UniProtKB/Swiss-Prot annotation:
SMART domains recorded: ZnF_C2H2 (SM00355), ZnF_U1 (SM00451)
Native source organism of the sequence: Schizosaccharomyces pombe (strain 972 / ATCC 24843) (Fission yeast)
An annotated GO BP: mRNA cis splicing, via spliceosome
Molecular function GO labels: RNA binding; zinc ion binding
Subcellular localization(s) per the UniProt record: Nucleus; Cytoplasm
Residues modified to Phosphoserine: S360
Name of the molecule in the record: Pre-mRNA-splicing factor sap61
Underlying gene: sap61
UniProt biased composition (Acidic residues): 355-365
Assigned keywords, A-Z: Cytoplasm, Metal-binding, Nucleus, Phosphoprotein, Zinc, Zinc-finger
Matches recorded under InterPro entries: Matrin/U1-C_Znf_C2H2, Matrin/U1-like-C_Znf_C2H2, RNA_Proc_DNA_Dmg_Regulator, SF3A3_dom, SF3a60/Prp9_C, SF3a60_bindingd, Znf_C2H2_jaz, Znf_C2H2_sf
Length: 492
């Protein structure tokens, strides 16, 4: 069945309304899981692009003067419009009788929010494992390129993240083709990371604004760079462009070295190769990608992009510091737990109509996956493995006095000596609770210590009694015990 021009336009209008509603539904859903949030944002970005393309086609259809379209409008506006209506209805019925299995496309179901299916989703292919769905940046490849640059101090990955946009420490003569490849790779990664984590942002427009700012800064005299050689030489400053060879794509620190280079055989061979090459290789496009201004532009854009991603870079540095304290097994367990949590939270909590999904609530009440038997936190979920390791909750401290009860972690073990369970165990042994019995968990040791404590107490009482002296009426001085014995015998 061939569709008419008006039906095609009507279908396009319906598609625009469905796309608009689909985007609104995804913005209202606002899931907590980063993976699910990014998945819906990328879907919204795709729908926006589809909305633009459909709008352009519909606008062209409205503005064009099609003979078939004019004939359809004339038939609809005719006096016998019911005849045309029944004629169209008959064609539709005849088509479906001929093709009874023909599926009708339901736009409401096509653009509805669907839960993540088991397996690898499209959003999983956009991020590396180190990036954790946009929470952190993975700059290990750029770091390897940086430390392999000539005359660059070898620094740690953590320091590299801190001084990512500090390009002034690299001398200008060392900014060769290898350096250009490095900053180009870094710039492309930052652009790609921003597009993947902010799919609804217009990055092209943002970069256009940055380019305008760079042109203004370049004309005004960008720090470390000069856009006009004549002005730089006139002011007595070193002109960066004056010491740059566009043929060999090299910087030179002094004008004497630069002049000597232009007379060298290597430079002359490079000039001959450029002259003998095809015109396409020396086009304006390639010229814009070379020279100090192109290098300064990439550095300027990297600084701007790192400022936009400053929070992510801070989180990345904190994550690197934290991961340095973990073992390989702990890192693997943490990654598995994070991936499991991302998949568990990927089910949307809002349905197409905007109501709460009762099935997701039932899933949350099911048994929590806890293979490591980690303690539960305040939210009812297992605490992170690194926190469990930090507090030593994997160490067992049994106490025989408490009925062989096992305490997990030093903190809980030290605290239990003042709790009711331990005090009750001491009283059952006939021992009066005292701080002296802290860190004593064996019954035999506690009884031995208690016997020794009683003997020492009696000795202290005897010693105290012998230290007290008494004096009779005649002035004789004696101990309190002797005095009491003589007095009892009536000798005093």
């Amino acid at each position: 069945m061939s569709e008419s021009v008006l039906e095609t336009e009507r279908y396009a209008h319906e598609e625009l309304e469905r796309l608009q509603q689909a985007i609104v539904d995804r913005q209202v859903a606002n899931p907590k899981a980063p993976r699910e949030r990014l998945r819906l944002e990328h879907q919204s970005a795709q729908f926006l692009n589809q909305f633009r393309e459909t709008s352009k086609k519909l606008l062209v259809s409205h503005e064009s003067s099609d003979r078939l379209k004019d004939q359809e409008v004339a038939r609809i506006n005719a006096d016998d419009d019911l005849t045309e209506f029944y004629k169209s209805l008959g064609e539709i019925q005849e088509f479906h009788k001929k093709y009874p299995d023909h599926k009708v496309e339901d736009l409401s179901q096509l653009y509805s929010i669907k839960p993540s299916q088991p397996g690898i989703d499209e959003i999983d292919t956009l991020f590396r494992g180190e990036e954790m769905y946009g929470r952190f940046m993975d700059l290990n490849e750029c770091y390897e390129e940086y430390i392999n640059l000539s005359n660059v101090q070898h620094i740690s990955y953590l320091e590299y993240l801190k001084n990512l946009e500090d390009f002034d420490q690299i001398p200008k003569p060392e900014k060769n083709q290898t350096y250009i490849n490095y900053i180009t790779h870094l710039y492309e990664y930052l652009v790609s990371f921003y597009r993947r984590t902010h799919p609804l942002s217009n990055l092209d427009k943002i970069i256009a604004v940055f380019d305008t700012e760079f042109d203004a800064a370049w004309e005004a005299g960008l720090p470390g760079w000069y856009s006009h050689n004549a002005e730089a030489e006139k002011d007595g400053k070193d002109s960066t462009e004056a010491f740059y060879c566009e043929v060999c794509q090299k910087f030179f620190g002094k004008i004497t070295v630069f002049e000597a280079h232009k007379k060298s055989k290597a430079h002359n061979k490079a000039v001959k190769r450029m002259q003998s090459s095809s015109p396409s290789t020396t086009s304006n496009t390639n010229e814009k990608q070379k020279g100090p201004k192109a290098i300064a532009r990439i550095e300027f854009l990297i600084k701007k992009l790192t400022s936009l991603l400053d929070d992510v870079r801070k989180d990345t540095r904190e994550n690197v510091v934290r991961r340095q304290t973990l073992t390989a097994a702990e890192r693997l367990a943490e990654v598995e737990a994070a991936e499991r949590e991302a998949f568990e939270q990927s089910t949307p909590s809002v349905s197409v109509e905007g109501n709460q999904d009762e099935e997701s609530d039932q899933d949350d009440e099911e048994k929590i996956y806890n293979p490591l038997k980690l303690p539960l936190g305040w939210d009812g979920k297992p605490i992170p493995f690194w926190l469990w390791k930090l507090h030593g909750l994997g160490k067992e401290f049994p106490c025989e006095i408490c009925g062989n009860y096992v305490y997990m972690g030093r903190k809980a073990f030290d605290k239990h000596f003042t709790e009711q369970r331990h005090i009750y165990g001491l009283k059952c042994l006939g021992i009066s609770p005292s701080p002296l019995f802290n860190q004593i968990t064996s019954i035999d040791e506690a009884l031995q210590l208690w016997q020794k404590y009683k003997v020492d107490s009696k000795k202290r009482e005897t010693t105290m009694a012998s230290l007290n002296e008494m004096e009779d009426d005649e002035g004789n001085v004696m101990s309190e015990k002797v005095y009491n014995d003589l007095k009892a015998q009536g000798l005093l």
